[in-house]
């Protein structure tokens, strides 16, 4: 009887450890792919050079083309506005009123985005 209980306990411990290891691997890989962001109203004092994800809606009439591939625009969460500078190709869904996540850092009082992600609703249809 004692041996049977011991074997069952060992089996349960091995299954538990395997499940914990599997969950840890899944969460570690998800961490790299899930994009969390802060809305403009939650951004207070940002450290210079610290990587940050800022998200909100592109404010109407705030898109300014500075050069061929450089733009500035303002995102808002209807509480606070936040100016963003971006250089590169814009996402296909980028337009006024569209949800955007900007990944970048603060430099000399301006947020310099190195990547823009356009958010869409559940009825996404790629541009034709």
From Swiss-Prot:
Pfam families: CcmE (PF03100)
Membrane topology label: Single-pass type II membrane protein
SUPFAM superfamilies, alphabetized: Heme chaperone CcmE
Gene Ontology molecular function: any one: metal ion binding
Residue ranges that the UniProt entry lists as topological domain Cytoplasmic: 1-8
Residues annotated as transmembrane: 9-29
One GO CC term, this protein: plasma membrane
Keyword Cell membrane: yes
GO biological process, one term: cytochrome complex assembly
Subcellular localization: Cell inner membrane
Family note: Belongs to the CcmE/CycJ family.
HAMAP family: CcmE
Physiological role: Heme chaperone required for the biogenesis of c-type cytochromes. Transiently binds heme delivered by CcmC and transfers the heme to apo-cytochromes in a process facilitated by CcmF and CcmH.
Name of the molecule in the record: Cytochrome c-type biogenesis protein CcmE
Species this protein is from: Rickettsia peacockii (strain Rustic)
Gene: ccmE
């Amino acid at each position: 009887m004692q041996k049977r209980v011991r074997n069952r306990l060992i089996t349960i411990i091995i299954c538990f450890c395997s499940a914990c290891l599997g969950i840890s691997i899944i969460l570690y890989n998800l961490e790299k792919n899930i994009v969390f962001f802060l809305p403009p109203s939650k951004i207070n004092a940002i450290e210079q050079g610290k990587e940050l994800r800022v998200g909100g809606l592109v404010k109407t009439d705030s898109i300014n083309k500075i050069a061929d591939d450089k733009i500035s625009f303002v995102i808002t969460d209807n509480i606070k506005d936040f100016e963003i500078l971006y250089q590169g190709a814009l996402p296909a869904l980028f337009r006024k009123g569209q949800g955007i996540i900007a990944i970048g850092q603060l430099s000399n009082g301006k947020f310099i985005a190195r990547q823009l992600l356009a958010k869409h609703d559940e009825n996404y249809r790629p541009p034709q």
